[in-house]
């Protein structure tokens, strides 16, 4: 399926940091199961993500956003097509990609400090160097006073800060984020969105961020890729034509929000109609 030509930005895309990785997705398809029970989650998705770009994958539940993200992470191989990062095929997880989940995925028996430094210890980073990295990252994310706490003692927002800090400590060129703020209240979500933008502006990593929130996608992303309902195909690929910082109350922001809402609702309605009639969504 051919994607609509991207909209033009009103601001240049900032330069990527040294080592930021391009991601090339070519004809990505994913089928779960076989025979009559087979489910086509993704179908022929093609996209090129330049290093340092912040991309949001947007669409209704079940459109294959997380499936595509898991394929980029190397967690789940494609049925057909390919994904390459910095020119190398993605076949399994690697240190060049860090994943942040909605469920935090922290080790409950470890302190905040131990969680942040876990990957550094696995890599065999010298203790003094690891101490310095943990202190620096914790300071940037407001965690310095919580290093001795355990995850159970933290709010959801603080736990997600720890999850992000653990990834930043390893300094991968790509950050993959699967609805990381979806379980948070509105105020905490906005605070962490701003924190993420600040971190991205400083480190300029390639970020692929899954969300079903249209407002979140517009607020965060350089670029938004809208996927169709199952099977997930590219419905629209657009650059966000708004300068940062973005005002969610502006006419331009809300015009784009209405446009994207129309696209997403169209896919939701197609699926609902297919469910009612028993026909295919194709």
Go through each PLM region and give its residues.
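The feature captures the beta-strand-to-loop junction immediately N-terminal to the Walker
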Residues: 58-60
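Helix-to-loop junction immediately C-terminal to a conserved catalytic motif
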Residues: 73
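Conserved ABC transporter NBD signature motif
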Residues: 81-93
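Short coil-to-helix segment of the ABC ATPase nucleotide-binding domain corresponding to the Q-loop/switch region
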Residues: 110-118
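Conserved ABC ATPase "signature" region
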Residues: 117, 121, 128-146, 198
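Conserved ABC ATPase signature
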Residues: 150-154, 158
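A short, proline-enriched helix->beta-strand linker immediately N-terminal to the Walker B motif
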Residues: 169-173
């Amino acid at each position: 399926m051919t994607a609509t030509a991207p909209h033009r930005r009103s601001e240049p895309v900032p330069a990527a940091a040294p080592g930021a990785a391009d991601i090339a997705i070519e004809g990505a398809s994913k089928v779960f199961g076989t025979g009559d029970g087979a489910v086509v989650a993704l179908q022929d998705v093609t996209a090129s993500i330049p290093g340092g770009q912040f991309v949001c994958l947007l669409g209704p539940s079940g459109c294959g956003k997380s499936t595509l993200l898991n394929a980029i992470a190397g967690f789940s191989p494609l049925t057909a097509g390919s994904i390459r990062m910095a020119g190398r095929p993605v076949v399994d997880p690697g240190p060049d990609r860090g994943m942040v989940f909605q469920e935090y995925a922290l080790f409950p028996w470890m302190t905040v400090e131990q969680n942040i430094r876990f990957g550094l210890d696995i890599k065999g980073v010298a203790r003094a160097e690891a101490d310095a990295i943990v202190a620096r990252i914790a300071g940037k994310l407001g965690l310095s006073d919580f290093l001795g706490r355990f995850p159970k003692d933290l709010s959801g927002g603080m736990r997600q800060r720890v999850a992000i800090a653990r990834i930043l400590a390893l300094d991968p060129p790509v950050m993959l984020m699967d609805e990381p703020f979806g379980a948070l209240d509105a105020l905490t979500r906005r605070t962490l969105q701003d924190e993420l933008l600040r971190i991205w502006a400083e480190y300029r990593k390639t970020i692929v961020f899954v969300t079903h929130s249209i407002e979140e996608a517009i607020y965060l992303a350089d670029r938004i890729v809208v996927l169709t309902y199952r099977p997930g195909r590219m419905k629209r690929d657009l650059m966000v034509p708004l300068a940062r910082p973005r005002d969610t109350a502006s006419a331009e922001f809300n015009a784009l929000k209405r446009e994207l809402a129309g696209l997403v609702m169209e896919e939701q309605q197609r699926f609902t109609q297919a469910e009612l009639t028993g026909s295919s969504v194709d």
